[in-house]
Amino acid sequence: MPSQLAYLAGVFDGEGSFGMWSKGKKKGKEFRASIEMCDGDVIFKFLSHFKMGSITIRVPKNKKHKVTYHWRVNHDKGKQIVREMLPFLSKRRQAKFHGILSGLDK
């Protein structure tokens, strides 16, 4: 559904992130796409639409803070999702993604 994809890409463009993340000492880096926010219904739309990834619910120790929902997808599945959203992402995000992929090819 293109309108759903465009909506999710817009939310991701504003609130999400992607890049190469360290897995720990001597283990190298992996690609990750993720988004974290207080609106759980929006986060669950990512899981429902893309049918991959995982959601972590973080309950803060401080009662004044809100519960947050974190959706994350690693490796090739993360790249696949960003590629699907790419036409709807800002030019800056598109350039960043292509730059990351160029770095992986080296």
Which residues are covered by each model-predicted region?
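Internal intein/HINT superfamily modules and their associated LAGLIDADG
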Residues: 1-106
